[in-house]
C-alpha cells in the first residue's frame, strides 16, 4: 500500500489518495471519522479544535460499504478556510491586494520549518512553508491510518496507543488484561494515560505551561497484538520492519526520538538481561518468556506484542515567543505567534497509532498479499498453523 497527502492548514481541504488496499474490506466513513475525532481530543489542545469538526468524505474506491481494490480518495474539509479565502486562495492577487494582505510572515519561528523551508524554496512569505509543514496535515495521515487499522482488525491484529510521560510526569507501569481494556482506560483519560494519578499530574503540568505562555512535550507508546511471526525481513536494510516503524514515528511533527521494546535501557543491562528466551508449547507454538525486544528481532516480528515509543518535543509555537530575525529587515524580533496547542502529546498518540498501523498493514499485505481480503486472511491462517508446528 502507499498514499500521498495534499492540502494546506488553512486551505479549502486536505486530501489523501490511498493505493493498494485489497478489495472486500468493510469500510464506511464512520470508521475514519471515529479516528479523526480521537485526534481532536486531548487535554492541551488549542482553539483550532473548536473550529474544526473533522468529517471525511470518501470520494472513490469504496462502494456500498466495501473497498473495490481501486485507489481510495479521502477528503476532509477545512472549515476555517472561510476566513482565509483571499489569503490562501489559488488565484493571483492584484498588486494592491498583495500590499493589503496582513498575514505575510517574514519572522521565522524557532523550532519550525519556516526559515529552512523558505531558503529551500525561495519563499519570501513563509506562510507558504508553515501552511504545509503544520501538524494539521496529520489529519489525513490519521484518515489513512484508520483504513490501515481496519485492514489489521479484519486480520485479528489490534493497535492501541497511550501516553506514558508529559512534561516530566511519568506514568507508573500499569497492567491490563487485554488491549481492549487498555483502549477503554485511555479513551476515558483526558491525557490518554493508563495511570490515573499520573494523568492528573500531567493535566496540572499542561495548565502550568499554558499559564506561563509555554508548551510541554512527552512520550507516547503504541502496542500491537496479533502480528504473525516473520513479518518484515532481515535480508536488506530497507526492508527491516523496525527500521520502517522508526522512520514512520520520526515522520510525525515534533517527534525527536524513537525506541522499540526496552530501547535505550538495553545500553544499561548485560545481554543476559536483554535477550528474550525462546519457549514452545503445543497451544501457541514458539513464544518468548519476556518481550524486551518489543516484538521485533532481526527486522522481523517475533509474534510477541510490538511495542514502539516516540518522544515529542514541546510545540515550538509559544505565546511567550523566542527571539528570531525578520528576513526582510534582518532586525531581531520576537517570533510571530500562530494559534497553537500548549500540549499535543495525547493527540500525538493517535497519530502514532495511525503511522504504526500503516507500516504494519503494508508489511502484512506485502508478505501475505493478494488483491482480496478473504485470501489474505486464509494465507495468514495457513502461515500461523505452519509456524506453530515448525
From Swiss-Prot:
Parts forming coiled coils: none
Q: Example GO molecular function term?
A: FMN binding
What is the purpose of this protein?
A: This reaction introduces a second double bond into the aromatic ring system.
Q: Which gene encodes it?
A: aroC1
What's the record's note on cofactor binding?
Reduced FMN (FMNH(2)).
**Any keyword NADP?**
yes
Q: Which residue ranges does the record annotate as region Disordered?
A: 95-117
Cofactor dependency:
FMNH2
GO biological process assignments? amino acid biosynthetic process; aromatic amino acid family biosynthetic process; chorismate biosynthetic process
Record-linked InterPro entries = Chorismate_synth, Chorismate_synth_AroC_sf, Chorismate_synthase_CS
Which amino acids does the record list as binding FMN?
132-134, 253-254, 298, 313-317, 339
The family line of this record is: Belongs to the chorismate synthase family.
Keyword Metal-binding on entry:
no
**Which residues of this UniProt protein bind NADP(+)?**
39, 45
Q: By its UniProt entry, which PROSITE patterns does this protein fall under?
A: CHORISMATE_SYNTHASE_1, CHORISMATE_SYNTHASE_2, CHORISMATE_SYNTHASE_3
Q: What does the record give as EC number? A: 4.2.3.5
What's a single GO CC term here? cytosol
Name of the protein described by the UniProt record: Chorismate synthase 1
* Pathway assignment: Metabolic intermediate biosynthesis; chorismate biosynthesis; chorismate from D-erythrose 4-phosphate and phosphoenolpyruvate: step 7/7
The entry's keywords: Amino-acid biosynthesis, Aromatic amino acid biosynthesis, FAD, Flavoprotein, FMN, Lyase, NADP
Which proteins does it associate with, and in what oligomeric form?
Homotetramer.
Amino acid at each position: 500500500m502507499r498514499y500521498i497527502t495534499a492540502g494546506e492548514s488553512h486551505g479549502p481541504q486536505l486530501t489523501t489518495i490511498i493505493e493498494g488496499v485489497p478489495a472486500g474490506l468493510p469500510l464506511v466513513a464512520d470508521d475514519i471519522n471515529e479516528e479523526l475525532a480521537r485526534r481532536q481530543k486531548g487535554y492541551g489542545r488549542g482553539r483550532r479544535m473548536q473550529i474544526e469538526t473533522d468529517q471525511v468524505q470518501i470520494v472513490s474506491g469504496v462502494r456500498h460499504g466495501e473497498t473495490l481494490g481501486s485507489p481510495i480518495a479521502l477528503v476532509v474539509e477545512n472549515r476555517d478556510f472561510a476566513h482565509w479565502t483571499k489569503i490562501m486562495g489559488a488565484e493571483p492577487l492584484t498588486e494592491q491586494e498583495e500590499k493589503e494582505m496582513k498575514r505575510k510572515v517574514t519572522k521565522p519561528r524557532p523550532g519550525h520549518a519556516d526559515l529552512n523551508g523558505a531558503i529551500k524554496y525561495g519563499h519570501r512569505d513563509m506562510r507558504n512553508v508553515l501552511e504545509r509543514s503544520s501538524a494539521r496535515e496529520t489529519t489525513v495521515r490519521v484518515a489513512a491510518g484508520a483504513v490501515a487499522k481496519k485492514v489489521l482488525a479484519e486480520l485479528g491484529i489490534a493497535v492501541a496507543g497511550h501516553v506514558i510521560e508529559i512534561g516530566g510526569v511519568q506514568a507508573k507501569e500499569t497492567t491490563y488484561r487485554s488491549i481492549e481494556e487498555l483502549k477503554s482506560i485511555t479513551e476515558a483519560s483526558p491525557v490518554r494515560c493508563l495511570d490515573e494519578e499520573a494523568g492528573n499530574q500531567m493535566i496540572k503540568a499542561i495548565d502550568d505551561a499554558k499559564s506561563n505562555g509555554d508548551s510541554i512535550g512527552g512520550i507516547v507508546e503504541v502496542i500491537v497484538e496479533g502480528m504473525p511471526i516473520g513479518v518484515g525481513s532481515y535480508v536488506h536494510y530497507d526492508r527491516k520492519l523496525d527500521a520502517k516503524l522508526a522512520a514512520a514515528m520520526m515522520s510525525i511533527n515534533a517527534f525527536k526520538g524513537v525506541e522499540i521494546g526496552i530501547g535505550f535501557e538495553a545500553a544499561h543491562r548485560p545481554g543476559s538481561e536483554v535477550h528474550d528466551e525462546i519457549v514452545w508449547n503445543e497451544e501457541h507454538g514458539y513464544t518468548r518468556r519476556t518481550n524486551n525486544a518489543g516484538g521485533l528481532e532481526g527486522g522481523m516480528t517475533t509474534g510477541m506484542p510490538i511495542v514502539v515509543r516516540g518522544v515529542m518535543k514541546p510545540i515550538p509555537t509559544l505565546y511567550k515567543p523566542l527571539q528570531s530575525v525578520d528576513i526582510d529587515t534582518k532586525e531581531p524580533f520576537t517570533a510571530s505567534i500562530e494559534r497553537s496547542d500548549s500540549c499535543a502529546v495525547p493527540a500525538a498518540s493517535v497519530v502514532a497509532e495511525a503511522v504504526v498501523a500503516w507500516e504494519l498493514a503494508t508489511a502484512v499485505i506485502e508478505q501475505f498479499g493478494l488483491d482480496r481480503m478473504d485470501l489474505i486472511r486464509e494465507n495468514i491462517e495457513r502461515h500461523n498453523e505452519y509456524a506453530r508446528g515448525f
